[in-house]
């Protein structure tokens, strides 16, 4: 498997043996802390007995039934639970196997909404630069990453506006002013494209793999909502990373007044890493409008998969009953406080940011100037190697060829205790101290 991304059959990662809670063990017996919940998916931790029992029980009855032939009781129950957690206006769920598929299906549904409304000319989707929405060709075109260019030859180019930043701000602008510039870009672009042709605007309320837990000021989300309403554009929130409670609310949109989307997309934490599961959520009024015009008939072998939905129901039930959303908020605040303390003793931690248990640390050459380290140093790869040796599994990126900085995610499972947080921060501190010494030596 590793040969697909390394191009060689050399030494690969360690072989996994088992996992429980926030810990993973390899075949040699070495223990790791899952600092980023895999790729920010393992919300309730590994080896949860309730989830394993739900998996066994459902597998013993039926693993697969195609939705055209049978309705799965657990898909109905999961949809109802999601509607209750997501709140008014996101009443119905369409289940698929992964985030990229959910984004694709959500956009297809949005197109059906336009047709049901008698607006066949609406087809354009505006997204942000940077952003990350998946790994299919359509979702890559939304994501605006130059690394994807070789895969997109012949594909219609995406329509992008700038995403707002909180750390790497344009010269002379504060976060509020920069956010206002970005919302003005949205208005200008809708007008330039022709409002009657614009179908949707898609954004990540908290950036995941494109910007390391960056979010905008509250005013940004409210103004985006107002602009979309003004021009009849559907607002889609990609909550694949931030949703299912990770940000300290079920949807990150709930952190800000007036920010509610028309459509929302969930994955990762929805299945908790136990099964491939994703969904988009839609208002009953839009679902009924589409149904009245013939329905949303899109074939997908594993949509509303009975086993996946049974496991997803157990994951969300565990999340609710053990108050893991509230725990994400409280433990996440403690985590950021500890990371900021670490920042105070470091010359290379430029920024600590995030919401709930979705956080990032940006690494810089110099904290005062915010100067980035040279690409040749591969600072993220070096931190990951140091962390792995210490027993920490960390995800990080150098975004858009370094244009938006080097950062590592600190997003452990929502079940992490303060003792777990202390161990993570202590280990990370050692890694960054080692890196500081290496940088000082190299000049």
What are these regions (language model features)?
Residues 1-443:
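Conserved N-terminal phosphate-binding loop of PLP-dependent enzymes in the Aspartate aminotransferase
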